[in-house]
Each structure stands twice: as C-alpha cells, then as structure tokens.
Amino acid sequence: MAHKKSGGASRNGRDSNPKYLGVKRFEGQLVEAGNILVRQRGTKIYPGMNVGMGRDFTLYALQPGIVKFSIKHGKKYVNVLSIQ
C-alpha cells in the first residue's frame, strides 16, 4: 500500500514561444528597400522618412539608404536617409 496520497498535477510547465522582437538594423547601417528595421508590439518606435509600418507594427525601409534614429516631441523615430 502507498504511504502517501497521490499529489495533484503541477500547474506550471507552460511557456510561450520566443517572438524575436527588437531592432534588426542599427544606426549607420546600410539597408535596401524592404529590409526590416524593427519588430515591435505597438508603436514603441514610429516610422520616419522612407520607413513604412506593417500591420503588426513592423517598421521596414521603403528606399535604400542609411538608418538614422531620432527623438522628436518625446517619441522615437527611425528614418532611412537616401544616399545619392
């Protein structure tokens, strides 16, 4: 006969898959049109010049150029400065 009653099932043991968010191209880097610059949840960083925003708030380059971050009115922006 068992000396102890059976314990209840553990209520831990679950975890969500990683989402790989964050800045993908940093300031000064050369990018091509369509390159993903930032993956984020919500508008942590806003799109600036030559930058588009996807349905899931992903920021991507619209033109080739150099990545530049800036802060205006308390908001962070990412821009792509075209090289011509």
From Swiss-Prot:
Superkingdom classification of source: Bacteria
Entries under InterPro entries matching the protein: Ribosomal_bL27 (IPR001684), Ribosomal_bL27_CS (IPR018261)
An individual GO BP term: translation
A single GO cellular-component term on record: cytosolic large ribosomal subunit
Record SUPFAM superfamilies: Ribosomal L27 protein-like (SSF110324)
MF GO annotations: structural constituent of ribosome
Pfam families hit by this protein: Ribosomal_L27
Region named Disordered: 1-20
Keywords associated with the record: Ribonucleoprotein, Ribosomal protein
Family assignment from sequence similarity: Belongs to the bacterial ribosomal protein bL27 family.
Protein name: Large ribosomal subunit protein bL27
Species: Dictyoglomus turgidum (strain DSM 6724 / Z-1310)
Highest classification ranks of the organism: Bacteria, Pseudomonadati, Dictyoglomota, Dictyoglomia, Dictyoglomales
